[in-house]
Curated annotation (Swiss-Prot):
Keywords: ATP-binding, Cytoplasm, Kinase, Nucleotide-binding, Pyrimidine biosynthesis, Transferase. Catalyzes the reversible phosphorylation of UMP to UDP. This is Uridylate kinase. The gene is pyrH. One of its GO terms (molecular function) is UMP kinase activity. ATP binds at residues 6-10, 39, 43, 134, 139, 142. Belongs to the UMP kinase family. Its EC number is 2.7.4.22. Pfam families: AA_kinase (PF00696). Transmembrane segments: none annotated. Its main location: cytoplasm. UMP binds at residues 38, 60, 107-113. It comes from Pyrobaculum aerophilum (strain ATCC 51768 / DSM 7523 / JCM 9630 / CIP 104966 / NBRC 100827 / IM2). Homohexamer.
């Protein structure tokens, strides 16, 4: 069975956490695809470029290269992983055909790493996407802004999309976007959202347990 893991870029802001994830991924059975976010490096570089008047496309490129840098770091800790970071879905599939573990970052401007993870999950025929996020579950509203936000243990993609589209959640509190949801929904790929600070939750979700929120068709 193929596993697809989306790692929040915030994971890479904690050195020990990166090592723990490497250990968990190394010990997973079967084939594993990992998509990394850009994290603080991406946010900082994008902010500087934006201040300097760079185009949105150029800002996106900075985010992409930051995510690929995180991917390369993880690859360096996974001795049996494909040694390069695929730059598009074609390169990913070529790497996937001959390696047990493939790690990638962003693919192209205008496309989030959440969408990349959804595309990868679709391409490899994964039944689930494991989203190690910067929040411990999906909430009815952004819990950092609304203390009355309800934690949602199980929900459908239609409900999730409404939450992401909500005007009170700019960016969907960095969880996913409507494009990634569309891809996952059309393939009926289950998504598990859980606290990215807990690498052990990857193991739990890989077993079909729900350590945070479970999103289904």
């Amino acid at each position: 069975m193929a596993l697809v893991i989306k790692l929040s870029g915030r994971v890479f802001e904690d050195e020990e956490l990166v090592f723990k994830y490497a250990g968990v991924i190394r010990n997973l059975s079967g084939k594993v695809a990992v998509v990394t976010g850009g994290g603080e490096v991406a946010r900082r570089y994008i902010a500087i470029a934006k201040r300097g008047g760079a185009s949105n496309t150029f800002q996106d490129l900075l985010g992409i290269y930051a995510s690929r840098l995180n991917a390369l770091l993880l690859i360096s800790l996974l001795k049996d992983a494909y040694p390069r970071v695929p730059a598009n879905i074609e390169e990913f599939l070529e790497a996937w055909s001959g390696h047990r573990i493939v790690v990638t970052g962003g693919f192209q401007p205008g496309q989030s790493t959440a969408t990349v993870a959804a595309l990868v999950a679709e391409a490899v025929g994964a039944s689930a996407l494991l989203n190690a996020a910067n929040i411990d579950a999906v909430y009815s509203d952004d819990p950092r802004r609304n203390p009355n936000a309800q934690r949602l243990r199980e929900l459908k993609y239609d409900e999730f999309e409404k939450i992401i589209r909500s005007s009170s959640l700019p960016g969907g509190y960095e969880l996913m976007d409507v494009w990634s949801i569309s891809i996952l929904k059309r393939n009926c790929i289950t998504t598990y959202v859980f606290d990215g600070r807990r690498p052990d939750h990857v193991v739990a979700a890989a077993r079909g347990e729900n350590p945070g929120s479970k999103i289904t068709c």
